[in-house]
């Protein structure tokens, strides 16, 4: 049995006035990020910064697999429940908020631990963010194949589900622009319209957001990205199915009904387009039988996980841990310990 209690010896992150350092834990949905983060928190003095575009919304607890009240109380968490579902939360806002939190947590003598699966946010912090993804021949070819099989009006309808703002501007026969909008969404997980309004630009000093603020320019030696990735995709698929079943049993449909009952939320809001919520909303609208919700929700979640893994593989500095390995948690804790101890040595701490 692995001991995850905080030891008496010094395993403390560097203290100010030293430059900030941070540890990051990324992975696809259902890969075990929350459990790993809490295990790290039992050993090291950390505060968790959520890197999840769905967890920012209040009243969306079950379908987002939000940490429980006990988990939130066990260690300080940030960027959870900070927006009403009526409000948007952009990548630019995340960069600005994360910048301030990394500095503040460091000033308190603790280590920022960034945890989540919104890869666009990680990319903004780690690499800077281009205005929008470049053309990808493989994605374009797949879209062209779908268009040949289904027709452009069908793809326009698919675009309307993920990017209603762009779809509203485009004619169903405007194949070139529909293809580009779908390409951007599939590559980034974000609608084309969000890139057109966010206006993030990458600079040599960091990322400048819509509010004119830059993220911290932290050298690679002062940051560590641990990536939870399955060796066996079937393992992750099983976890996704089990988690969706648990959400349904916990009252997920009632949670979506309560959101609809507010009367001020619409299906095209960013919050309501979150995976699971979109499918439940459509089922409640009668677009398909409620009996199909489970399969559609699981399918959409698997597609999300596939996109997340594609993003992760484009991050060369990540340190991969096979999340389906029996000793996955031990590996995560070893990487975290090495990172913290390396920082202590750099600062002359024992």
UniProtKB/Swiss-Prot annotation:
Q: Which domain of life is it from?
A: Bacteria
Keyword Nucleotidyltransferase attached: no
Name the residues annotated as site: Interaction with substrate tRNA. Answer: 118, 140
State its Enzyme Commission number(s).
2.5.1.75
Recorded GO molecular functions are:
ATP binding; tRNA dimethylallyltransferase activity
Q: Where does substrate bind?
A: 29-34
Reactions listed under catalytic activity: adenosine(37) in tRNA + dimethylallyl diphosphate = N(6)-dimethylallyladenosine(37) in tRNA + diphosphate
Instruction: Give the GO terms filed under biological process for this record.
Output: tRNA modification
Q: Keywords, A to Z? A: ATP-binding, Magnesium, Nucleotide-binding, Transferase, tRNA processing
Q: Where is this region: Disordered?
A: 1-20
Q: Where does ATP bind?
A: 27-34
Enumerate the cofactors the protein uses.
Mg(2+)
Instruction: Give the Pro residues compositional bias ranges.
Output: 10-20
What is the role of this chain? Catalyzes the transfer of a dimethylallyl group onto the adenine at position 37 in tRNAs that read codons beginning with uridine, leading to the formation of N6-(dimethylallyl)adenosine (i(6)A).
Q: How does it assemble?
A: Monomer.
HAMAP family referenced in this protein's UniProt entry, alphabetically:
IPP_trans
Query: What protein family does this chain belong to?
Result: Belongs to the IPP transferase family.
Q: What is this protein called?
A: tRNA dimethylallyltransferase
**Originating species:** Albidiferax ferrireducens (strain ATCC BAA-621 / DSM 15236 / T118) (Rhodoferax ferrireducens)
Encoding gene (name): miaA
